[in-house]
A protein has these predicted regions:
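Trp- and acidic/polar-enriched beta-sheet ligand-binding modules for extracellular glycan
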Residues: 89-93, 117-205
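N-terminal Sec-pathway targeting helices
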Residues: 1-13
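Extended extracellular/luminal ectodomain segments enriched in beta-structured repeat modules
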Residues: 92, 101-111, 178-179, 209
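Disordered, acidic Ser/Thr/Pro-rich linker "stalks" and the adjacent N-terminal cap
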Residues: 32-105, 116-132, 221
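Sec-dependent signal peptide cleavage junction
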Residues: 19-39
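Serine-esterase "nucleophile elbow" of acetyl-processing enzymes
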Residues: 49, 187-255, 270-277
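Catalytic His-Asp segment of secreted/periplasmic serine-dependent ester chemistry enzymes
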Residues: 325-400
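Oxyanion-hole/transition-state-stabilizing segment in secreted/luminal serine hydrolases
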Residues: 263-300, 309, 318-326
Length: 400
């Protein structure tokens, strides 16, 4: 009898242990997928893009576009090129998309992103002028039937912005039950003869969150390299990703501002992060630090503060090496600061390593302009390509 019970017990253990392991692994897998879908900015989310995010998430490309007026047509705002924009004839002026042909399952919640050609992310910090940049505006939706002209009434305002001083903004909008979406600009920030609204505008399916979304903070090199217009024959970062990994088409903002150092980044980072609902935050400060030969310990501590701010916001920091340049200070101090970035990688394993811009430009010195600091136009295009290549390999798991 005892022998029979012993055999029965062993049989139960043989069956039960694998079952427990299977159930545990299944639960963990489901939990991870739920986190990726339901909380894409969770600190527990790994660096790779969730499989659920696809290029189909960009739902506004070539959708019927309409505008109140325009020096340039509404269709310029959502065509295949970021080199073209819609430009109003004065303000108020609106730009509307008919999304009625998009499956309703892909537009119950959307991400609206608009981009303006003003070079600096926040031009007020360094006193530069804006260029036809929306300052006061609303995002509106409408349940009216699609397939024709925009509705004359019944617009529902779902986001209101006043006093904007950024050249791009993002808004997560609940659009369930609606077919139309528009931006209505009532005031513009610009200079003489540049007081029209001029933008590109993308709309993404945000049903599964907004994991495939990037912002690149940095200095004038970031500003020159990570905008949307073609630079040095190279298209925008998002288009480069899509060209090599057609499943994806990331939302992307350039957060570059001329003259800024890592200390300036620390000053503004928390304010900026509140505006950015996405996942990946590139931190590309250091050229101005190196050119001023700042104390390496201070530089490192600034970056620690930046990384902690990004992690505390539930996002993922992405950090490259400082680019090589010809100035004596950068050549002398740059390696010391890049060594601190290497230390940062070890201290914070959550960091995704960006491109080694020092090695690249040191090996391609002809891509540095006559000011000995900034890339040439072709160099800016190469800078952008280096970013895309690095992220294709690291994040999108695509060979380049």
């Amino acid at each position: 009898m005892k022998k029979r019970l012993t055999l029965l017990g062993l049989l139960i253990l043989v069956v039960a242990i694998p079952l427990v392991i299977f159930l545990t692994l299944t639960y963990q897998n489901v939990k991870q997928k739920a986190q990726a879908l339901g909380n894409v900015t969770s600190r527990s989310v790994i660096g790779q893009i969730p499989e659920e995010v696809t290029a189909g998430s960009l739902i506004s490309r070539n959708a019927p576009a309409f505008a109140s007026s325009g020096y340039y047509p509404a269709s310029n705002a959502n065509d295949d090129s970021y080199d073209t924009t819609w430009r109003s004839q004065g303000t108020p002026g609106w730009l509307a998309y008919d999304l009625s042909n998009v499956p309703t399952s892909q537009r119950s919640k959307v991400l609206v992103v608009w981009y303006n050609e003003t070079s600096n992310y926040d031009h007020t910090i360094i006193g530069y002028n804006a260029y036809n940049m929306p300052q006061d505006y609303t995002i509106d939706i409408n349940p009216g039937d699609g397939g024709g002209s925009p509705p004359g009434g019944g617009w529902i305002t779902v986001a209101t912005v006043k006093g904007n001083h950024y050249h791009s903004r993002e808004h997560v909008i609940d659009m369930a039950g609606n077919n139309w979406i528009r931006i209505n600009v009532t005031r513009v920030d610009g200079s003489l003869e540049n007081y029209d609204a001029s933008i590109n505008m993308d709309v993404y399916d945000a049903t599964y969150g907004i994991a495939d979304n990037w912002i690149f903070f940095g200095d004038s090199i970031t500003a020159g390299g990570m905008g949307h217009a073609t630079t040095g024959g190279v298209k925008a970062f998002a288009q480069l990703i899509n060209a090599r990994a057609p499943k994806y088409f990331p939302a992307q903002e350039s957060g570059g501002i001329g003259y800024l150092t890592s200390a300036d980044g620390v000053k503004y980072i928390n304010m900026w992060l509140k505006l950015f609902p996405g996942k990946y935050v590139a931190l590309s400060y250091g050229t101005n630090d190196a050119n001023g030969c700042v104390d390496a310990d201070n530089f490192y501590n600034n970056y620690v503060s930046l990384v902690q701010a990004v992690l505390n916001a539930g996002k993922i920091p992405v950090i490259p090496h400082i680019p090589w340049a010809r100035t004596a200070n950068v050549q002398h101090c740059g390696p010391m600061l890049n060594a601190r970035i290497d230390t940062l990688y070890k201290a914070f394993p959550q960091i995704i390593k960006g491109p080694d811009l020092w090695a690249f430009f040191q090996g391609n010195q002809n891509l540095i302009s006559n000011d000995n600091l900034h890339p040439t136009d072709t160099g800016f295009g190469a800078y952008r390509q280096q970013w895309a290549n690095a992220m294709l390999t690291t994040v999108y798991k695509t060979k380049v």
